[in-house]
């Protein structure tokens, strides 16, 4: 894998290299190969990953078709759903 270093900017080249390695899945593979994985464990992990992918695809498809609401966007700002008061909100907590 190669990355060009422009104007002796090593930080930018390292950032580009890290991004390429992330896209290629090298970090994930290094993590998996860090220890021995029994064939039965590998098979179970791969099966679980496939199930997760299938569920994610099905969920995305339902969201596109409008049958499933998409995740609500996070609210940034002062209010954040605390009501009009903006404080702790609600009734005071009972003493223990």
Swiss-Prot record:
Chain residue ranges for the region called Disordered: 37-96
InterPro entries given in the database record: Ribosomal_bS21, Ribosomal_bS21_CS, Ribosomal_bS21_sf
UniProt GO cellular component terms: ribonucleoprotein complex; ribosome
Domain of life: Bacteria
Keywords recorded for this protein, A-Z: Ribonucleoprotein, Ribosomal protein
Composition-biased stretches (Basic and acidic residues): 37-52
Pfam families: Ribosomal_S21
Gene Ontology molecular function, alphabetical: structural constituent of ribosome
Protein name: Small ribosomal subunit protein bS21
Taxonomic classification: Bacteria, Pseudomonadati, Pseudomonadota, Alphaproteobacteria, Hyphomicrobiales
């Amino acid at each position: 894998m190669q990355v060009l270093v422009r104007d002796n900017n090593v930080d930018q080249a390292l950032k580009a290299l890290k991004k390429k390695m992330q896209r290629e899945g090298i970090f994930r593979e290094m993590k998996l190969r860090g220890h021995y994985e029994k064939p039965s464990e590998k098979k179970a992990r791969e099966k679980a990953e496939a199930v997760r992918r299938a569920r994610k695809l099905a969920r995305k498809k339902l969201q596109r078709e409008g049958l499933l609401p998409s995740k609500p966007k996070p609210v940034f700002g002062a209010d954040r759903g605390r009501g009009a008061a903006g404080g702790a909100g609600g009734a005071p907590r009972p003493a223990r």
